[in-house]
């Protein structure tokens, strides 16, 4: 999210869903975002180095209970109102909503998108504080018909969306005091929503560790945002590891694939009140916990002592 959009979310949130939260704090956040916007020298549609990063702004817990989503179980067309390239193969897409309403999507829920003859699930990275629109961070794959379709259609064209309430596997507030999140590639997107809820909710004391695996630094779209959230919140720790980063490189963080040793070093231990959330490509599920659509727990997480009830496969 760009600074101006960050301010717009703060203002919209203070007007619609800011009950119980200091209006002064919200206003200050909006002013800060506008100051950053002014200092950046970037106007709407402008370009700068920050235009190629994903900037979700500070955590905002704009929660919505199940059943309030703007999309139901029938397909509804939403117009593409903005598209911004954030890496060589990823775009941030903004779709419009009628009557200036918010998306109203419950935490960690997803939307189904339809286009180019295929249907795929996507978890929005914007919060319910954004009025009149929602945003998707889409990885564009060479073989991905829908992702290529959304990355190339003209502004003003529409994509069909719907929401099936039963796709929410776990809901905020989460039934744990310590949470480990393991993400592969674009699997970080549902965790953006979860972290907004946890870190943005006053009084929430849940401790969270996020371990994200990407191929290269260019693929780690949210690393700067996660690092900023971790720096400002002692309850959150973010670890990023790259598997194919060229050498030499400016990257000074961890390298290599996820393995039992890394997970044991950073995840909360397999004790009561601990929950492990997993999201990523099929190979990640196979290694860590078994296929996504199979309830039984296998793989590295079982070997580390976690139970089936402690591991949620997104």
What are these regions (language model features)?
Residues 2-40, 211-314:
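Reductase modules of NAD(P)H-dependent flavoproteins
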Residues 58-157, 214-215, 243-244:
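Ferredoxin-reductase
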Residues 176, 199-208:
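Conserved S-adenosyl-L-methionine
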Residues 178-180, 209, 275:
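Structural motif
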Residues 188-202:
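Histidine-anchored nucleotide/phosphate-binding helix
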């Amino acid at each position: 999210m760009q600074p101006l959009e960050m301010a717009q979310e703060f203002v919209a949130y203070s007007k619609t869903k800011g009950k119980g939260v200091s209006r002064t704090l919200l206003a200050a956040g909006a002013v800060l975002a506008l100051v950053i916007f002014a200092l950046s020298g970037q106007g709407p549609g402008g370009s700068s180095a920050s235009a190629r990063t994903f900037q979700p702004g500070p955590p905002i817990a704009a929660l919505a209970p199940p059943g309030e989503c703007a999309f139901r179980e029938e397909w509804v067309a939403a117009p593409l109102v903005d598209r911004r390239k954030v890496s060589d193969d990823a775009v941030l897409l903004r779709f419009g909503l009628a009557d200036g309403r918010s998306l109203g999507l419950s935490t960690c829920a997803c939307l189904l998108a339809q286009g180019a003859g295929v249907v795929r699930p996507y978890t929005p990275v914007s919060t319910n504080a954004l009025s009149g629109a929602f945003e998707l961070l889409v990885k564009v794959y060479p073989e991905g018909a829908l992702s290529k379709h959304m990355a190339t259609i003209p502004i003003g064209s529409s994509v069909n969306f719907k929401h099936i309430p039963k796709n929410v596997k776990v809901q905020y507030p989460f039934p744990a005091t310590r949470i480990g999140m393991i993400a592969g590639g674009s699997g970080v997107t549902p965790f953006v929503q979860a972290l907004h809820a946890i870190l943005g909710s006053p009084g929430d004391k849940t401790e969270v560790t996020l371990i994200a695996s990407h191929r290269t630094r260019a693929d780690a779209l949210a690393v700067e945002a996660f690092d900023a959230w971790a720096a400002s919140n002692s309850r959150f720790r973010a670890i990023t590891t790259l598997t194919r980063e060229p050498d030499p490189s400016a990257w000074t963080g961890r390298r290599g694939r996820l393995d039992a040793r890394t997970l044991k070093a950073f995840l909360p231990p397999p004790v009561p009140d601990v929950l492990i959330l997993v999201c990523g490509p099929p190979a990640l599920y196979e290694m860590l916990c078994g296929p996504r659509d199979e309830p039984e727990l296998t793989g590295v997480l079982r070997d580390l002592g976690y139970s089936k009830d402690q591991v949620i496969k997104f």
